[in-house]
Structures are given as structure tokens and as C-alpha cells.
Regions:
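Structural core segment of the AMP-binding/adenylate-forming
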Residues: 86-145
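Generic alpha-helical structural signal
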Residues: 10-14, 43, 47-50, 123
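Conserved AMP-binding/adenylate-forming core of the ANL superfamily
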Residues: 25-74, 78, 95-100
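Short hydrophobic alpha-helices that are characteristic scaffold elements of the AMP-binding
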Residues: 77-83, 105
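Flexible, non-catalytic linker and terminal segments flanking ANL/adenylate-forming cores
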Residues: 1-8
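AMP-dependent adenylate-forming
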Residues: 12-38, 142-143
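Residue-level preference for short coil/turn positions at secondary-structure junctions
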Residues: 20-22, 59, 107, 131
Length: 145
């Protein structure tokens, strides 16, 4: 594959997915174990998440992605692209005030949030923003179960 013939990150990922041996592409160290993601896992997660996102956005809508560096970040970014959305990445070090400014500026239709720590920073902002149609979490948040 010649990199100058690749049009976008989705195409690059798919080319790699097609040619790799389907072993682990990511290793995520967790508290007491390592979570492995195979190429097939990542591919199927991108498709599933993209299908979910597509229910709530139209082409060109923004999706705010609040996450640490972890495999789900890349999966989310590619899923947003596949859905026709625009990823608005946000640092996890932002304050509630920072997030409110970003949310007001980009009007995201979907929020993708890594964990409870990040959710608590924007929890009070969400009810005021009628344009937010869906919140997706990487980790389980008790409040939403």
C-alpha cells in the first residue's frame, strides 16, 4: 500500500485490517489484567458504534469526544468519521467552564465520554443544551443503568 494513495484514515484502517493477521492490534493495561483488542474486535466495534451514532447525526454534525488516550478513543474517532460526523476532541484536563465553551461553540449532537470523572465535569451542562441527542460512555456509569 502506498500511503499517498490513501484518501483518509478510514481507508487506511480498512486497508490495514484487510492485510493484517488478525492478532492483537491494541493492548490496554487495566488494573490487574491486560485487555487485548484484535483487528476484528476493533473493526466490529467501529461498525457497531458507527451504526449507533448514525441514528442521531446527519452528515457534518459534530460529536464531542472526551477521553484519555485509550483504544476506544481511536474506535470512536473512526466511528464518527464513518457516520459522516466531525470529531471534536477535548482534553480530559479541561474544566467545566472549558467544556461549556467548547459545547456552546461546536453544538455537538453526540457526546462520547470515557468515564465518570469526565462525565461529572459536564453533567450540569448537558440539560441546558437541547442540541445534544445522545451520550455514549466507554465505561459503565451507574447513573445511566
Amino acid at each position: 500500500m502506498e500511503i499517498n494513495k490513501v484518501n483518509n484514515l478510514l481507508e487506511l484502517f480498512y486497508n490495514q485490517y484487510q492485510t493484517q493477521d488478525k492478532t492483537s492490534v491494541f493492548l490496554q493495561p487495566l488494573k490487574e489484567v491486560e485487555k487485548k483488542y484484535s483487528w476484528e474486535d476493533v473493526y466490529s466495534n467501529i461498525i457497531k458504534l458507527s451504526e449507533e451514532i448514525s441514528k442521531y447525526i446527519k452528515k457534518g454534525d459534530r460529536c464531542l469526544l472526551i477521553s484519555e488516550n485509550r483504544p476506544e478513543w481511536m474506535i470512536s474517532d473512526l466511528s464518527i468519521m464513518l457516520s459522516g460526523g466531525i470529531t471534536v476532541p477535548a482534553y480530559t484536563t479541561y474544566t467545566e467552564r472549558d467544556y461549556e465553551y467548547i459545547i456552546d461553540d461546536c453544538s455537538p449532537t453526540v457526546l462520547i465520554i470515557s468515564d465518570k470523572t469526565q462525565y461529572l465535569k459536564i453533567k450540569n451542562i448537558i440539560p441546558k443544551k437541547k442540541f445534544i441527542k445522545k451520550i455514549i460512555f466507554f465505561d459503565v456509569i451507574e447513573e445511566f443503568n
